[in-house]
Amino acid sequence: WKDKTFNGYHRADGQVGTKNVWLFIPLVFCENKNIEKLKDIFENELLPKKEVSYKNLLRSLIEEKSVEEVAEKNSNENLLDNIEVKFINHQGGCGGIRQDSELLAKLLAGYVNNPNVAGATVLSLGCQNLQVDIFKKALKEINPNCDKEILIYEQQQIGTTDQMFQMVIKDSYEAIKRANKIERKPAPISKLSIGLE
């Protein structure tokens, strides 16, 4: 097995993932609504649904277009075909005791540190127990060499929800485009991460 390789996504810290994922996560449950809005926006505009592709395929075949024509059209529709975008929400980050927030910070930092994750957009309200500094500290403790692109937005510092959404959408889209350019390259089997840390 020593000479075996797999094609993976190489991260700056030396980890290698089998997937290329961008995460959207809230530090507090109060941001779940905004995460859900972003999910709706990004899934509808950025990530074409498979069912729609299949419907378009059938519609094109009914219109007597060749399978090759349809495949070429569909390949041009999804410009970001080398990355997945995932949205996480939870019910913590505010109430409870400080240790609850610290444990949640470690959990969320673990998600971001996963070798399959290229980067993340993190939403914070600003007044919750799980502050941005606690999250950053948890990430550094898990992986001091983590150099992933992490976009963090504190809603109360930005101003209106509309202003925040404009920033988050613009910045995240640009970051996702950059992450989409990461290509699979051979890596030794020893770099393969299996299971949970």
Task: Tell where the protein language model's regions lie, with residue ranges.
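Metallocofactor- and cofactor-centric catalytic cores in central/energy metabolism, strongly enriched
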Residues: 1-197
